[in-house]
């Protein structure tokens, strides 16, 4: 089971392109469901529904010949494709009919959708300004990307606050122990700093 990365999406652009984008990612049978990865960069058909790792060597070799990948898992995790196991999950988008903006939220496995994915989307919709913010608390990192005209114009990622990193490390240290003693826990303060309880 992966750590879930939380993602916020903000898109701005001409009203007609906003509508086109929504129509592309909106489920045609359920207007309240959206999929970004599988609609904006579809997985090659030969890999869809297959096993990972690929057990049939003939199928794997044909997949490699067509896609450069032996199974769906390798393709999806490649940073030149989605960069994450399942694409986006639990995707919600908000806009109105005369809108020039879309706001959204979705989750991804282990990390955000790749920069290469968003560059491809930006090449398809060059007049849209696309910004993505992400945070994965399990591994304590966060960041943001911005794209326009088929280019990444801003990219930054870093560890989150030192307190969060130390908290993650403390949890990791004690994850296998039966009892965690209070003196070993990190106690947050409202100032954003941290302190451990009595030494």
Name each model feature, range by range.
Residues 1-199:
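Intrinsic low-complexity, intrinsically disordered or marginally ordered coil/linker segments
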